[in-house]
Amino acid sequence: MIRKINATIEDFEDEKVLIKIGVLTLEAYPSLNVIRYFKKGDQYEFFASLEISEWNTSLYIFKDKIERDVFESLKKVSKIGPRIASKILRKTDAEEFIQMINSQDTALLSSLPGIGKKTAERLISELSNSFSAYSTGADTQSYGNNNLKEAIEALETLGFQRYEIMKVIGQLDLEDLKTEEIIKECLTRL
């Protein structure tokens, strides 16, 4: 089993990335954070997962252990598998995904590729206890409240990435804060 790879990014192609390890160039499926934070020529020790089936061998690479752990948990959910798990982690940050599961947000989960309402409900029921080790401060607060949702949408409109917003929100005491106050607090920390 391959767990980590020290590799150099050679090129990005559609859903894949070419990585060079010594004299070998391999094709891998990257997570959103690999796409977001790395560019051609960067060398990094990626977390990895090698999936072998009778039809295919696929390598998936991740920026950190949390992403790989989320991928490993996702692919075990019935009717998900590594392909859909990879597509999910190319559209959302692992911490944001954990937040969606912990807050039981079927609407946000349903917006991910390959996920409908029933699959979102299945993800919540099968993964609800899987990410307690990765919970953030925002998990214990009312993520579902309208003020917070409106603040997140406003900050995204201003150009901030959701994963950045969620990290800051995890540091805040959201009790009784209005939308404007949440935005103001986030802007001072972003």
From Swiss-Prot:
GO CC annotation, single: Holliday junction resolvase complex
Q: Where does the protein end up?
A: Cytoplasm
What InterPro entries does UniProt report for this protein, alphabetically? Hlx-hairpin-Hlx_DNA-bd_motif, RuvA, RuvA_2-like, RuvA_C, RuvA_C_sf
Residues covered by region (Domain II): 64-138
**Cleaved signal peptide residues:** none
Q: What does this protein do?
A: The RuvA-RuvB-RuvC complex processes Holliday junction (HJ) DNA during genetic recombination and DNA repair, while the RuvA-RuvB complex plays an important role in the rescue of blocked DNA replication forks via replication fork reversal (RFR). RuvA specifically binds to HJ cruciform DNA, conferring on it an open structure. The RuvB hexamer acts as an ATP-dependent pump, pulling dsDNA into and through the RuvAB complex. HJ branch migration allows RuvC to scan DNA until it finds its consensus sequence, where it cleaves and resolves the cruciform DNA.
Its recorded name reads Holliday junction branch migration complex subunit RuvA
Q: What is the lineage of its organism?
A: Bacteria, Thermotogati, Thermotogota, Thermotogae, Petrotogales
Query: What gene is this protein translated from?
Result: ruvA
